[in-house]
Amino acid sequence: MIPESHPRYKSLITREKLAQYTKTGIVSLEGLTAHGRGEAFDYLLGEETTESALRAEKIAAALLLSANHPVISVNGNTAALAAKEIAQLQLASKARVEVNLFHRTDERVQAISGLLKEHGITLVEGTVSRYIPLDHDRGLCHFDGMHSADVVLVPLEDGDRAQALIDLGKKVIAIDLNPLSRTSKVATVPVIDEVTRALANIARFCTELDQDEITGLTREIHGTGFIRDALEYIRERLLNVLD
C-alpha cells in the first residue's frame, strides 16, 4: 500500500497500475519498458505541462475539430493509463477510437476493448486489413477507422507507423514525452507531454475553441518548433537543477 503522502505517489501508483494490467494482457511487458523511458523524460520536464506543450495541445484540438474523419489510435499503455481521458476527448471531439497494437493478439484486443467500453468509449470494430504499408500487425486497421481518417491522434506510438500514416497523407498528432523520438520528429504536431495531462488538455480545448481560433491555429503548423522548445526547456532545467 503506497501512502498518498509519498512524494512519488502518482508515479508509483502509475507503475503499479501498469504492472497489474500486464496480468490481464492489456499492457505488454515491453510496454513497461516504454513507460519507464517516457517517465525519465517527464522528470527532465519537471513533470508538468510546458507552455509550448500547451500550445501544441491547443493546435491538436483544433486539428481534431477541423477534421472530416478524426481518429484516436489506442494501444495498451494508453488504455491502461488514460481510458477516462480518452472518453472525455471522444465526447469533446467526436473522434472515432480504434485499438491498434504492436504486440497484437485477439485476446489483447478484446481485453483493451473491454476496458475502453467500461469507460463509455465507442470503438471502431470489425474486420481489419493491412491498409497501412507495414510488414507487421501495426499495419492492420479498420476501413472506417484509420484507413479513412484525415487526422490521427497517436499517443505513445512508434515512429515507423507514425511515418507511414504521414506518407498516406494523414495529419498525425503524436503524444510522446521523448522529444528525440522518431515519432515526435515526423508528427504534424508533436505534443511533448505526459499522456493523461495531454489528453485532458486537448479535450478541454475542444470545448473552448471557436471557429476563428480553429482556423487560425491550423493555418500553418511548424512541428519542429515544439521539439526545439522541449529540448531548450530541458537544457535550462539541467543548467539550474542545483540552484
Swiss-Prot record:
Keyword Ligase: yes
InterPro entries assigned: PPS/PS (IPR002855), PPS/PS_sf (IPR038138)
EC number: 6.3.2.36
Pathway: Cofactor biosynthesis; coenzyme A biosynthesis
Alphabetized UniProt keyword annotations: ATP-binding, Coenzyme A biosynthesis, Ligase, Nucleotide-binding
Name recorded for this polypeptide: 4-phosphopantoate--beta-alanine ligase
Sites where the protein binds ATP: R15, R37, D176, L177, N178, R182, T183
Organism phylogeny: Archaea, Methanobacteriati, Methanobacteriota, Stenosarchaea group, Methanomicrobia
PANTHER family documented for this protein: 4-PHOSPHOPANTOATE--BETA-ALANINE LIGASE
Pfam families referenced in this protein's UniProt entry, alphabetically: PPS_PS (PF02006)
